[in-house]
Amino acid sequence: MANKHMSLSLFIVLLGLSCSLASGQVLFQGFNWESWKHNGGWYNFLMGKVDDIAAAGVTHVWLPPASQSVAEQGYMPGRLYDLDASKYGNKAQLKSLIGALHGKAVKAIADIVINHRTAERKDGRGIYCIFEGGTPDARLDWGPHMICRDDRPYPDGTGNRPTRTRADFGAAPDIDHLNPRVQKELVEWLNWLRTDDGFDGWRFDFAKGYSADVAKIYVDRSEPSFAVAEIWTSLAYGGDGKPNLNQDPHRQELVNWVNKVGGSGPATTFDFTTKGILNVAVEGELWRLRGTDGKAPGMIGWWPAKAVTFVDNHDTGSTQHMWPFPSDRVMQGYAYILTHPGNPCIFYDHFFDWGLKEEIDRLVSIRTRQGIHSESKLQIMEADADLYLAEIEGKVIVKLGPRYDVGHLIPEGFKVVAHGNDYAVWEKV
């Protein structure tokens, strides 16, 4: 087992050296679960926030699913080419928003929902399995032969799930991603989003529903500058209902996905391992933030260049609250992800709706000023129940927790440059 981990670590280091991702990336999720309800359209509304987002040092904005969808939020898409039926606004408004982002040197990330798809109409048996692509021609006009044959609610599918152990999405037909026509037409659609609409990269929704080998095809053939996958699986929990100390299998799954898609390319994954551990750690168990190997316990402890860290998103937080971060400790979460290696992602709600903009701005400014990046060196100085203290790149020190008598632990030449509810950040003078 030790040799296996040593080989994996060496492999990760070598891949990290060849990584083509920009080192100073800061992502921003530009919507929440209720954004579709906004009067006048969300795209138009977000246009008025572009200056603030760019001024904060954000490099990439993740936008909601743009295609026509049965579900208002966009996650039950049907006519993929139809960008005028979205609840967030029409195609012209979307392109104007992307143009405004590009004008501030900020890239636009599309939310790609391709694991499943809703049909336009029923077949002769009364089953919804006839798909419409949203164009006058036959692109993405599919039938039951494009549905996985093991998708029981939609019989007569002839395809196979790329990996039978992958997750099933019960609310809509699971698409057969091994079908050559499916691959070809989805690649064409992705390239259309990039060249015609201006998107720069992809966020793959429910990416655990199809294999990484298939995702590699879509990434390689659409050439995004950035891609991030949602691989959301459960952590390992003990009898007390809390995460086990060792979450190596969980983060290994994230690492494996990136390896298969292409470790030297633009592919990353959301670091759900770090999210789950951090959720619990800030509740008086900060010792969890040092793994058994002395490093960060999440994906950032193994392959930070390929990890997108976050505090909450439209699923875990917002109005869904599927896995929310403790609301009174959110800034501790940002103090962690914005000073640590990895690619941090800021959530719209926290930045604009929670009154945390100034504090988050300050942390991003420190990260940028000190050149903290996805592969910055992390030294964990202390990790006790009430104190987490770490030095990053020898330039920044961050403290989490209620303990205040830490002056003797701070080296000379550092001064406090940010502080808030149970967190503080020092910067080397």
Curated annotation (Swiss-Prot):
Documented EC number(s): 3.2.1.1
Sites annotated Transition state stabilizer: 315
Cofactor entry: Ca(2+)
Residues that bind substrate: 68-70, 75-76, 203-208, 232, 234, 252, 295, 301-303, 314, 320, 399, 404-406, 416-422, 426
Pfam family, one: Alpha-amylase
Biological process per Gene Ontology, one example term: starch catabolic process
Signal peptide positions (record): 1-24
Record: residues binding Ca(2+) 1: 115, 167, 174, 209
Chain sites annotated for binding Ca(2+) 3: 151, 168-169, 172, 174
Keywords (A to Z) from UniProt: Calcium, Carbohydrate metabolism, Germination, Glycosidase, Hydrolase, Metal-binding, Signal
Record GO terms (molecular function): alpha-amylase activity; calcium ion binding
Active site feature: 205 (nucleophile), 230 (proton donor)
Subunit structure: Monomer.
Family indicated by similarity: Belongs to the glycosyl hydrolase 13 family.
Protein name: Alpha-amylase type B isozyme
Organism whose genome encodes this protein: Hordeum vulgare
This protein's encoding gene: AMY1.6
